[in-house]
C-alpha cells in the first residue's frame, strides 16, 4: 500500500523484515489477542498503547505468556497496556509521546502516567538536563513491566546517572521498587506520587489508580520512598528540579 509492505500476521512480518518489536494500537476488544500474536511470533518486546482492555483478557494473555516462558519458550517483554511507550532521545521512539520535548542526556524517567512523564521530561529539558530513556508503564491494573523492572534496567544502564520515578495511588508497585532501590540502586532517585487528595475507593483517571488499602495512598508511598533514600517532591512542578 503506497510502497509500504503489508503482511497477513505478525509472524510473517517478523520473518520478512527481521522486526523484533510490535506496537499495539488495536481497539480494546482485540488488543489482548494482538499482544499474544506478537508473543507467539517470538518478538523481543511488545508495547501496547491501547486503553480499556478488559481485565479478564489481560489476565488470560499474562497467564499464557508465563506458561510459554515456563515451558522454555522465548520471553517477550510487555510494556503497557494504556501506556505512551518508550523513547531514547535522538535514537528511537516507539509510542505516542511528543518527541520535541525530549533532549538526549543521562537522566532516566519512569512513570505510570503518560502526562506526568511528559511534564517531568519537559521540566528537565527546560533546565538543560537531558534524558537517557523515558518509559511510560501504563495505568491499567494488569500490565507488563513494572517500576522495579525498569529501575533494575536503569541501575544497569551505563548511560543513566540518575532517575525520576513517578507513581500514583493504587497497588504496591512503587513501594516494592523503592525497597529494591534501597538495597541495590547505585544511582540517585527522585520520587513523586500523584493523588495526595484522592479519596479511598474512587478511581482517579487510570483504572489502576484506586485506593483499596492504607498502603495504596500517596502519603504511604511517599513515606516509603523517603525511608528508602529517595529525594521526594510533593509538587509535580518540581519533579525535574
Segments predicted by a language model, with ranges:
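Catalytic-core regions of core metabolic enzymes
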Residues: 1-241
Amino acid at each position: 500500500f503506497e510502497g509500504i509492505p503489508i503482511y497477513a500476521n505478525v509472524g510473517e512480518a517478523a520473518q520478512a523484515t527481521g522486526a523484533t518489536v510490535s506496537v499495539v494500537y488495536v481497539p480494546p476488544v482485540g488488543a489482548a489477542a494482538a499482544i499474544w500474536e506478537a508473543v507467539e511470533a517470538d518478538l523481543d518486546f511488545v508495547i501496547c498503547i491501547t486503553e480499556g482492555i478488559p481485565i479478564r483478557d489481560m489476565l488470560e494473555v499474562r497467564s499464557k505468556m508465563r506458561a510459554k516462558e515456563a515451558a522454555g519458550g522465548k520471553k517477550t517483554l510487555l510494556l503497557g497496556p494504556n501506556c505512551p511507550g518508550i523513547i531514547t532521545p535522538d535514537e528511537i521512539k516507539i509510542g505516542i509521546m511528543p518527541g520535541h520535548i525530549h533532549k538526549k542526556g543521562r537522566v532516566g524517567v519512569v512513570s505510570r502516567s503518560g502526562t506526568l512523564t511528559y511534564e517531568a521530561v519537559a521540566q528537565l529539558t527546560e533546565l538543560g538536563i537531558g534524558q537517557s530513556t523515558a518509559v511510560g508503564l501504563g495505568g491499567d491494573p494488569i500490565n507488563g513491566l513494572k517500576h522495579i523492572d525498569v529501575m533494575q534496567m536503569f541501575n544497569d544502564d551505563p548511560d543513566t546517572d540518575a532517575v525520576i520515578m513517578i507513581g500514583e495511588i493504587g497497588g504496591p508497585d512503587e513501594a516494592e521498587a523503592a525497597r529494591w532501590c534501597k538495597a541495590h540502586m547505585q544511582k540517585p532517585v527522585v520520587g513523586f506520587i500523584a493523588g495526595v487528595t484522592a479519596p479511598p475507593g474512587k478511581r482517579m483517571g487510570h483504572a489502576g489508580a484506586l485506593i483499596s488499602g492504607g498502603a495504596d495512598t500517596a502519603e504511604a508511598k511517599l513515606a516509603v520512598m523517603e525511608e528508602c533514600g529517595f529525594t521526594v517532591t510533593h509538587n509535580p512542578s518540581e519533579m525535574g528540579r
